[in-house]
Amino acid sequence: MGISIWQLLIILAIVLVLFGAKRLKNVGSDLGGAIKGFKKAVSDEDKKEDEKVTAEQKLEQKEGENVFDVKAEQKADEKSETKDKA
């Protein structure tokens, strides 16, 4: 089956005797600091990625503002001149 609560308590007591409470406290605080640093690095990376995507979208918007999708048409005067030359 699984590990019971009594077995976990015995293992914890053995670890405390071997390493001592002060050393375990230091290990715990070091581990907590490492986890905190990792989370901060991940969130900073996400923010940088979001800023990059936002900047690219703004750039694409600015580039697309001056683009017109129209069909070229000739003026009536130009059409008649073209027909006269032919």
From Swiss-Prot:
One example GO MF annotation: protein transmembrane transporter activity
One Pfam match: TatA_B_E
Name assigned to this protein: Sec-independent protein translocase protein TatA
Lineage: Bacteria, Pseudomonadati, Pseudomonadota, Gammaproteobacteria, Thiotrichales
Assembly and oligomerization: The Tat system comprises two distinct complexes: a TatABC complex, containing multiple copies of TatA, TatB and TatC subunits, and a separate TatA complex, containing only TatA subunits. Substrates initially bind to the TatABC complex, which probably triggers association of the separate TatA complex to form the active translocon.
HAMAP family assigned to the protein according to its UniProt record, in alphabetical order: TatA_E
One term under GO cellular component: TAT protein transport complex
Functional summary from the UniProt entry: Part of the twin-arginine translocation (Tat) system that transports large folded proteins containing a characteristic twin-arginine motif in their signal peptide across membranes. TatA could form the protein-conducting channel of the Tat system.
Places the protein is found: Cell inner membrane
Primary location: membrane
TM annotation in the entry: 1-21
Family, as annotated: Belongs to the TatA/E family.
